[in-house]
Structure formats: structure tokens, C-alpha cells
């Protein structure tokens, strides 16, 4: 049966317009993105099939072009469309973050860092550079690979803070394993960076670790 033959209240697009996007299942949201199905499958059937093939919506969103295009109903055009949608979401969060003080919008900080780092397959270390009113000046990824005391250089963080004319910074890195618990090395690194940045009167306000779920704030746990 075609989706056109379904009751209006059950059609994904009409359901979204009536109840909002949050009311839709992963399959219904994906069906709206797909727009059409394939022979023998409606858009919703195809969406359910793809979610089963990938294992989760997250895995589908994180797939590279080859992985994505290997599945029924998908190809380079859909991949490009999906990447554009994801990037618009990231830019929306970044713009929202820049409008307000980072300290007055802690959830906006979490949302942005989660969108920026959670899906990265390798460890990244970055900084949110803030002005004297704690408004965001810029976000920069500074280091790639294993994030420990040997791979993150305080002098490079200091150099970028000076270049941005920052008054404060929020540190962040991701744990691709999904476990957002700080290691002893994470705590030692945070202290080294605090000490280095204090020499140029730049405050470290927090260090967020991004894994599955909500990013962990080291400041909230008293680990700063």
C-alpha cells in the first residue's frame, strides 16, 4: 500500500506538521528525508529496512560515502543531501551559541560540542575561545589522535588564545569509545593548560568530554 493511501494522521509528513518532528519515529523521519521508496517498498518500509541494515540511525548518519551508497535506495545524491542537512544543523547550533554568553547558555555549549565531536571516529581536542563577556569568538580543533599530555602542546593553545584575543576558553575533546569519563591524563592535561593560560590571563572555564549522551563537564564535577 502506498503512503498516499494511509490515513492522514499516519503519514509521516502530515504527522510532523500536526504534532511536530519529535513525535516521529526514526523510520518516519528518515522516510521524509528519502521522500520516495523503491519497487515493493514504501518510503517508510525502505527507512525501516535501512535502519535495520545499519543498526541504528546514528550509524547511518555517520556512514562514509562508500558505506552509504552500498545500500538499497541510497547513492551519492542522497549522501550529499544528508551531509548538507547535517552541516546546516551544526551551523545552526554554532550561530545559536554565538548569540549568547556561553555561561548563560550551558546547554547550547553542550549541544554544539556534541554535534561537532560525537560522531568523529578519532580523538580530537579543541577550544571554544571566548571574549571578556564569555561570548564565543571561535571554535578550533587543535589536535588529532590520542589526546594525552604528550600530544597536546600548551604553547599551541596559548598561541591560538592570543591570536583570538580570548579572555577565557572552554576545552573539549571526544572519547570515540562513547564513555565520557575523564582519565587521570585528562585531569593532568587540564591542569597543565590552566597553568599555561593563566600566564597570559586567560581563564579556563571548563573542560567538556564528549561521548555518548550528554557531554561531561569537569567543572560541574569539581575536577577543575
Curated annotation (Swiss-Prot):
Keywords assigned: Hydrolase, Metal-binding, Metalloprotease, Protease, Zinc
Domain (MPN) ranges: 102-224
GO molecular function (one): metal ion binding
Residues where Zn(2+) binds: 173, 175, 186
InterPro entries in the cross-refs: MPN, RadC_JAB, RuvA_2-like, UPF0758, UPF0758_CS, UPF0758_N
GO biological process, one term: proteolysis
Gene3D superfamilies recorded: 5' to 3' exonuclease, C-terminal subdomain, Cytidine Deaminase, domain 2
Database matches in SUPFAM superfamilies: JAB1/MPN domain, RuvA domain 2-like
The protein, known as: UPF0758 protein PST_0473
Source domain of life: Bacteria
Family, per entry: Belongs to the UPF0758 family.
Location of the motif JAMM motif: 173-186
